[in-house]
Amino acid sequence: RQHRLWLHLHGDSDAIERVLAQDPEARILWAHSGFDRPEHVRAMLRKHRKLYADLAFRNDHASGGKVDPAWREAFIEFPDRFLVGTDTFTPERWYYIAEHADWSRAWLADLPPDIAERIGWRNGETLFASMMAPKK
C-alpha cells in the first residue's frame, strides 16, 4: 500500500476477491487472466475497476492469427485493461521468445490498431510508469 506497487496475482477469481476484500485499493495485474473463460474475465473486470489482466502463457484467445470472438469482445470492452505477456519463468522458455512475439503480433493485427497498440505495449507502459513517478 505504502508504495502503491502492483500485485501480480497468480490465482483464481476467489483469490482476487479475498485480496480486494482486505484492500479495496489494491492494484492487481491478474496473471494469465486467471486461466479463466473470457466471459468470467469480463465480469471480474466490470466488478473491479483497478483489476488488469495479462495474457501470458495462454493461447486460447487466438488461433491462426485470428482473435477468438469471445476474447475480441473482452478486448473491445476493456482495451485498457489487458497486457500481452510471455511468462518466461524458466530459462528454457527464452528460446521461444521470438516465436511468441511473432504469434502475438499476428493476433494483435486482427484487432483494431488502437486496441492492438494498447494491449501490445501501451497499457504496460501506462501501468508501470505510475510506479516510476518522482517522489515529492
Model-derived features with residue positions:
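Catalytic pocket-lining loop regions of alpha/beta-barrel enzymes
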Residues: 1-84
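Divalent metal-coordination and catalytic microenvironments
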Residues: 32, 53, 87, 116, ...
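Mid-to-C-terminal alpha-helical segments outside catalytic/metal-binding sites
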Residues: 80-81, 91-136
